């Protein structure tokens, strides 16, 4: 991305698919690090959109426990410790759940490791949603199982783990967690009905009511414990949706209830059998074959070749535990429904949970005859694939002209993409894709060898010799773990932060810091086609440098002065919103003449806005303020803000001023008072949605204090505290072995 790629560079991004991890999710962590260090809290941010309730960002997971690590640790230490903690939580959670379901130590440990390294955790690693939320789900299932087994002390653990899962993800992941809990309820309800039928009793609605009530209480308390984040995020989502700005709710709405049309669910079904061998679906360094199936590499559901095959084949059978069948059914079928429009194929997380349990249960309980049959069939399948693929590869060697034509076609198709400007990079990706078509390419050879190792291990487990059987046992475990490690290694990018800083300083960033400073604000005019490759500092990335912008890119957007991409180059309009500078790609010929050029490079052109108004402006009376909003010539008195903080500010007001206008989005929760006074007043929302303060006339200078204390966060915190009290009381009551 510009301006970090330099002219003549021969190295390109290993994984461009996670570019929003750089432009958004790593930036969120940097914001958390900065605000927790400076102010001890994450609240308001003036760095994007002209001001937004940053703490309520639905995609940032600011309520997750790993965010608190940034209070005490440096950025990368907090990042790595948080990931390690989530991996361990996921692994031990699945281990505990499988052990509670009667799975032996070795297969349970294998299941835990496969779950901790499953493809959904890996592909969304930079976003942290999937792992942050679903690392807790096995613990939710384990706690429910413990309560069902008679351990009443497990009662408070269920809502506690649900809350941790809610806080670790997005609103989408909250829904996925709720579905997982609902599947557990359905499993228990069916068991309850079967038990009642066995005793000759009826199990109608009345009989199921206590069970449903228990799960409902758990869910409500889990939501209550996380209400301090859940309520603000839900409010932000509803606000953005009301404005028609929430991408997932509005994209392609006129075309179909499916984002990619009615063919989408059919193609998704066709792609399901390919999940067991994901290397054929492309890689982040070449091409994404799943796009042909109206999907993408983000949505691979891989946790080892044999485990996926077992889940797809055996997971439906009655010999598998019902909870496996229900999780697999939910994970595979729900993405084919209109729910995929709102929850995407992240629903595959349910399939992964059920599939890992099905795999562990199969190898724990399958007899020698069953394993022999499976080993023979898999060996035959592997041999057929290897021989056939080798033959095709040899044929391809004799058709180099056709392969070159295919490569050129791929490059030309990608020329119109966001990164199409980087033609050498497109050529490299196409070359890699062509190379990966051959069976002996490392992309395909290593997974095939690991699959052969696993099949050999499965064959050895059928031996009557105990030593060979145990060897096969460990070959399977080692093979499937090696598979998920290989998948992860091909996705994750490793670098030395000291040699390659996350947001390196460039001549462009230095001039922006110097010219814009802490009081200015930037607007960005993007490249019309190759915006990701050509536009310097794509939205949100300037926040990493503490440079404020009027635009941003998130799933939710504030109801503020300017909507996204509205009038990005209108100097007069933007000047009223405190926009002092315009950034655009080098050589942009279409910048309006109102902007004054001050710096140019191959990567970036920088312009100043002569029409910019000060962010903090004073007015002698209301008439002057109204003239400011209705005309362009009204003079203002620039004011100084002393603190440099986001959530608590101090503005020096000279004598004779009675009104203050702040070129920042007004939002509920902003209050002000004259320093030394006790009473706080609400900030007024101006007609252009900026902030206005009526401080009254005074013949002496004063200090005005502002604070940001949103009501929705206060209400959510109160609900969380009340829920915590109920959970504690319920836990103490449940500890007396009273069933409720």
Region roles according to the model:
Residues 1-55, 237-241, 489-492, 496-503, ...:
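Hydrophobic alpha-helical membrane-insertion signals
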Residues 91-101, 105-190, 214-234, 239, ...:
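Membrane-embedded helix bundles of polyisoprenyl
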Residues 1-91, 113-134, 250-303, 333-336, ...:
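Membrane-interface coil-to-helix junctions
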């Amino acid at each position: 991305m510009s301006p970090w790629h330099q002219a003549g560079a021969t190295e390109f991004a290993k994984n461009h698919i996670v570019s929003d991890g750089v432009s958004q999710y790593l930036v969120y962590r940097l914001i958390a690090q900065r605000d927790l260090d400076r102010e001890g809290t994450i609240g308001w941010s003036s760095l994007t959109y002209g001001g937004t309730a940053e703490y309520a960002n639905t995609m940032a997971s600011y309520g997750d426990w790993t965010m608190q690590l940034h209070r005490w640790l440096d950025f990368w230490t907090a990042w790595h410790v948080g990931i390690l903690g989530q991996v361990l939580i996921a692994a031990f959670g699945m281990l505990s759940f499988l052990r509670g379901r009667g799975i032996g130590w070795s297969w349970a440990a294998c299941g835990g490791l496969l779950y901790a390294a499953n493809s959904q955790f890996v592909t969304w690693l930079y976003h942290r949603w999937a792992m942050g939320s679903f690392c807790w789900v096995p613990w939710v299932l384990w706690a429910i199982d413990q309560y069902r087994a008679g351990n009443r002390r497990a009662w408070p653990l269920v809502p506690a783990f649900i809350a941790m899962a809610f806080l670790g993800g997005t609103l989408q992941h909250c829904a996925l967690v709720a579905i997982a809990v609902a599947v557990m309820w359905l499993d228990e309800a069916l068991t309850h009905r079967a038990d009642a039928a066995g005793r000759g009793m009826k199990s109608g609605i009345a009989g199921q009511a206590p069970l449903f009530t228990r799960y409902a209480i758990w869910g409500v308390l889990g939501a209550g414990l996380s209400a301090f984040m859940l309520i603000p995020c839900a409010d932000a989502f509803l606000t953005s949706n009301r404005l028609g700005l929430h991408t997932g709710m509005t994209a392609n709405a006129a075309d179909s209830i499916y984002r990619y049309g009615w063919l989408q669910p059919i193609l998704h079904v066709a792609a399901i059998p390919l999940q067991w061998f994901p290397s054929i679906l492309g890689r982040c360094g070449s091409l994404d074959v799943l796009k042909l199936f109206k999907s993408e590499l983000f949505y691979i559901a891989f946790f080892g070749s044999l485990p996926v095959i077992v889940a797809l084949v055996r997971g439906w059978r009655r010999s598998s535990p019902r909870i496996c069948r229900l999780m697999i059914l939910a994970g595979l079928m729900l993405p084919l429904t209109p729910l995929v429009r709102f929850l995407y194929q992240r629903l595959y997380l349910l399939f992964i949970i059920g599939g890992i349990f099905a795999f562990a249960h199969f190898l724990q309980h399958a007899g020698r005859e069953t394993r022999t049959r499976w080993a023979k069939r898999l060996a035959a399948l592997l041999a057929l694939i290897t021989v056939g693929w080798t033959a095709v590869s040899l044929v391809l060697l004799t058709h180099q002209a056709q392969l070159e034509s295919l490569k050129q076609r791929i490059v030309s198709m990608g020329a119109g993409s966001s990164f199409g400007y980087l033609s050498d990079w497109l050529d490299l990706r196409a070359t890699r894709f062509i190379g990966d078509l051959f069976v002996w390419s490392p992309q395909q050879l290593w997974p095939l060898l690991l699959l052969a190792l696993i099949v050999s291990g499965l064959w050895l487990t059928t031996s009557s010799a105990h030593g060979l059987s145990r060897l096969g046992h460990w070959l399977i475990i080692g093979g499937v773990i090696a598979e998920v490690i290989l998948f992860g290694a091909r996705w994750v990018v490793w670098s030395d932060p000291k040699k390659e800083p996350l947001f390196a300083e460039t001549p462009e960033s230095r001039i922006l810091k110097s010219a814009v400073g802490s009081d200015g604000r930037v607007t960005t005019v993007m490249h019309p086609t190759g915006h990701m490759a050509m536009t310097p500092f794509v939205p949100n990335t300037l926040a990493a440098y503490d440079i404020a912008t009027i635009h941003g890119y998130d799933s939710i957007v504030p109801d503020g002065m300017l909507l996204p991409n509205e009038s990005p180059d209108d100097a007069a309009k933007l000047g009223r919103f405190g926009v002092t500078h315009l950034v655009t790609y080098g050589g942009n010929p279409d910048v309006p003449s109102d902007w004054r050029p001050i710096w140019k490079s191959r990567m970036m052109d920088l312009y100043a806005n002569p029409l910019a108004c000060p962010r903090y402006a004073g007015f002698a009376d209301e008439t002057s303020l109204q003239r400011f909003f209705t005309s362009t010539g009204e003079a203002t008195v620039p004011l100084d803000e002393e603190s440099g903080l986001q959530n608590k500010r101090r503005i020096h007001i000279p004598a004779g001023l009675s009104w203050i206008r702040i070129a920042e989005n007004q939002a509920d929760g902003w209050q002000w008072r004259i320093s030394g006074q006790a009473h706080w007043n609400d900030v007024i929302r101006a007609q252009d949605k900026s902030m206005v303060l009526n401080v009254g006339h005074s013949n002496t200078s004063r200090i005005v204090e502002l604070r940001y204390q949103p009501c929705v966060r206060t209400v959510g915190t109160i609900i969380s505290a009340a829920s915590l009290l109920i959970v504690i009381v319920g836990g103490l009551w449940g500890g007396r072995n009273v069933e409720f």
